Swiss-Prot record:
Heterododecamer (2C3:3R2) of six catalytic PyrB chains organized as two trimers (C3), and six regulatory PyrI chains organized as three dimers (R2). GO terms for molecular function: amino acid binding; aspartate carbamoyltransferase activity. Pathway: Pyrimidine metabolism; UMP biosynthesis via de novo pathway; (S)-dihydroorotate from bicarbonate: step 2/3. GO terms for biological process: 'de novo' pyrimidine nucleobase biosynthetic process; 'de novo' UMP biosynthetic process; amino acid metabolic process. Keywords: Pyrimidine biosynthesis, Transferase. PROSITE patterns: CARBAMOYLTRANSFERASE. This is Aspartate carbamoyltransferase catalytic subunit.
């Protein structure tokens, strides 16, 4: 039985197979590939895109979705996550999609289930489906020619699980990862080139990925205001002028902090394309994990 906890759970060949399936799901035509299958979603952190994307993907494939309301679940009565998941597993779901603020929690639940677990984000650690849809967006834009392409990931690269997953995934496809952040948000490793402002590197980039400031993961205030942060890290029309790069953002976008209003309308900005691709990629992942499950 296969789970998706981090992007390394899939080989490069498996990822390319997922992309092949995802292309077929881009037209959003309903089908019955997963008819009779039941998928449980457990979101202990807020989500708009990821949760809705999984739900729409599942329903387009003919599966049923059961959303556990964590606000009224027995975890509020003191039940452990392990007991909660073990009880859900006893009901016979075909997959469990989970998001939690605790790093490593989805992986720790594997021994309690007989179905695939899909990590929809665990604290600062990992967000594998987001990284896969980001890569799919890049891969399709460059017609599969990703070797040697350069990306700047801009913003809170220390706390962002999206940055973490992309740091691990994109180099597998030959993409040169560069990190741009203020000192307080810098990645603590040394295997990537790091810069202080986007202006230093933007001329050399094929892709720029802007990130949301992870305010909910900070214990102290680093900037007097988000506007102060935006001076060096917001993607503005001035930065876009005369340049041809792909602009990505995992969402939600803080307008005029991460990306300006004007740039969000620019055809080089692929934020909504990422969302569309996310449904197709997650549909392909659900198909793979559920149909290949050998209990």
């Amino acid at each position: 039985m296969q789970h998706l906890i981090r992007t390394s759970d899939f080989t490069k060949e498996e990822i390319l197979d997922i992309f092949e399936d995802a292309r077929g799901f881009l037209d959003f035509k309903p089908c019955e590939i997963l008819k009779g299958k039941i998928i449980v979603t457990l979101f202990f952190e807020n989500s708009t895109r990821t949760r809705s994307s999984f739900e729409i993907a599942a329903k387009r494939l003919g599966a049923e979705i059961v959303n556990l309301d964590v606000g009224t679940s027995s975890t509020k009565k003191g039940e452990t996550m392990y007991d909660t998941v073990a009880n859900i597993n006893a009901m016979g779901p075909d997959a469990i999609v989970i998001r939690h603020s605790e790093c490593g929690l989805p992986e720790s639940l594997i021994g309690y289930v007989d179905c695939p677990i899909i990590n929809a984000g665990d604290g600062r650690h990992s967000h594998p489906t987001q990284a896969l849809l980001d890569l799919f967006t890049i891969y399709e834009h460059f017609n599969g020619q990703t070797e040697g392409k350069k990306i700047a990931i801009v913003g809170d690269v220390r706390n962002s699980r999206v940055a973490g997953s992309n740091r691990r995934l994109l180099p597998r496809f030959g993409i040169d990862v560069n990190l741009v952040a203020p000192d307080c948000f810098k990645y603590e490793g040394n295997e990537f080139k790091q810069f202080n402002t986007i202006a230093e590197v933007i001329d050399d980039m094929d892709v720029v990925m802007s990130l949301r400031s992870q305010l909910e993961r900070h214990n102290i205030t680093y900037f007097e205001s988000l506007q102060e942060y935006a001076k060096d890290f917001c993607i503005t029309p001035e930065l876009m002028e005369g340049r041809d790069f792909l602009l990505l953002h995992p969402g939600p976008v803080n307008r005029n902090i991460d990306i300006s209003d004007e740039v969000l309308k620019d055809p080089r900005c692929k934020v909504l394309e990422q969302v569309r691709n996310g449904v197709a990629v997650r549909a392909a992942i659900l198909k793979k994990l559920i149909l290949n499950n050998k209990n």
